[in-house]
Amino acid sequence: MNIYPSRSEFDALIKRGNAVPIYLDLTADCETPLSAYSKIRENGPTFLFESIVGGERISRYSFLGANPRKIYRVFSDHCIITEKDHSEMTVPTPADPLQLIEEEMASYVPVHIPGMPPFIGGAVGFVGHEFIHSVETTVPKPSKNPLELPVLYYLITDSVLIFDHAKQVLRICVHALCDGTDTETAYNKAVSEIERIVALLQTPQTLTHCSLQEPKIDSVPEGNISQKEFVAAVEKVKDYIRAGDVIQTVL
């Protein structure tokens, strides 16, 4: 396998930061983003980004990630940080929940290598509706969270599979991180992860039989407001729209 940069090149690059992308290019004639995703998705939380340029035009890149370095699940009063070894730590949630993600990303000093795709790793996730309270404090916090969803959910990913549709190349990119380890260990760890991903991609897919079952419904749907209250709320929203205060509202 032709892995870049070489060990000697890496020793020079790591002097400019603490995170160097190590990569291997493969011909992508027998693999698609979906087939690759199906092979790596068992490695913990995953993501697949498809590039679309208007309508049905597919853009140049597809990005896949799995086996994140860290996972941040931020709730209103606490944050659960899960490491790659599945160990967990709970910390209080600051007034600005994004501060946790910003501090995490500030700990990395990535080394730029010319010719790399526009995305090779970082923070991938979502911001929930409830986050607006951290920006506009006049917006009240929901009194309940029945689904127990986090306000923020982010994967810190240092391993990314990049499909270059223009060149028909699949690039496996893993960052060598010098976070207290020596350069040789960091480089070898990244190379080993690349080799592990290659082995996953070379594993034949087995299609499993899936039988559909009728869902069991053991409850009766109940509304939380009456029809009269709902109609009144709709009329109020119409007034807001006519006044130019809103363009749409979710009731």
Give the label of every model feature segment.
Residues 97-114, 137-148:
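Short acidic (Asp/Glu) patches
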